[in-house]
């Protein structure tokens, strides 16, 4: 577990953080520029020093103002991945990976290299690598030091979209397989959805939210970060049924299911996180009997939000909320009201 209780004055920013982070999983840190995100992980890494408070990682005290403890960065057993890859241009990939390791554990080396898909890059030099490949090497180098925690400061921010998609797949696999906590600074809600278990929302140096991603997502506190043109529903559901003939799998939603294309990465019992755009959800008063849409679910209207060009409808299905966006015309014609039983038709689901 990571325990942080610190205070630091950074110009006009008063950074005050008090939290406990679990010993495993990805905790995303979200906030606007200047909110204190990078400052917080730099304090944890020992690159800067708080004016008071303490930082503990497991049984080890990294910093304690009252006790006069302030371990040097290299003694904190922390892996740090920066926005820039910071590889040595005159070293091969293999040498870059091993840099900083007192003794190289060959089995661990091969495990990390395979996990990040960089076996074929070992004899190459940074100048011949893509941005995504460079960041994978930088992540590998951090992991090979066998850190007790991994800090990542916007590792995808310098990459173009194809490279981001490439690297986020590796990061997702990494998050599931490494047995250490990961602190992940980002501006991207998409990265949070794909990678994070918990979310810290920082605003002007203060924590205004810290909870499971799904819980923060559905709270009003994240509204300013989301699209003004539609709502995005975020659900985390167990995979509990397969339809092998049509290569589909069903995610359990109470007594109902959401069907998605089968993927080899998941098995029965695994929890999958999905998003549903409100523009991809329509509403009917009766269950449609013959439709090409597979996901038709029964629910109750719990909230109605009218806009100039549309109406957003929140529908409670079992214990999960899904948003639909419909036209003003449709809203008037259907005469929808809170508490009404209706059916939603979901045209598209994203993993």
Curated annotation (Swiss-Prot):
Pfam family for this entry, one: TOBE
SUPFAM superfamilies (alphabetical): MOP-like (SSF50331), P-loop containing nucleoside triphosphate hydrolases (SSF52540)
InterPro entries: AAA+_ATPase, ABC_transporter-like_ATP-bd, ABC_transporter-like_CS, Mo/tungstate-bd_C_term_dom, ModC_ABC_ATP-bd, Molybdenum_import_ModC, Mop_domain, P-loop_NTPase
Binding site for ATP: 31-38
Keywords assigned: ATP-binding, Cell inner membrane, Cell membrane, Membrane, Molybdenum, Nucleotide-binding, Translocase, Transport
Annotated membrane topology: Peripheral membrane protein
Catalysed transformations (reactions): molybdate(out) + ATP + H2O = molybdate(in) + ADP + phosphate + H(+)
A single GO molecular function term of this UniProt record: ABC-type molybdate transporter activity
Keyword Acetylation recorded: no
GO cellular component: plasma membrane
Record localization: Cell inner membrane
Broad class of enzyme this protein falls into: translocase
Role summary: Part of the ABC transporter complex ModABC involved in molybdenum import. Responsible for energy coupling to the transport system.
Family from the record: Belongs to the ABC transporter superfamily. Molybdate importer (TC 3.A.1.8) family.
Subunit structure and binding partners: The complex is composed of two ATP-binding proteins (ModC), two transmembrane proteins (ModB) and a solute-binding protein (ModA).
Protein's name in the database: Molybdenum import ATP-binding protein ModC
The organism's taxonomic lineage, starting at the top: Bacteria, Pseudomonadati, Pseudomonadota, Gammaproteobacteria, Pasteurellales
Gene transcribed to yield this protein: modC
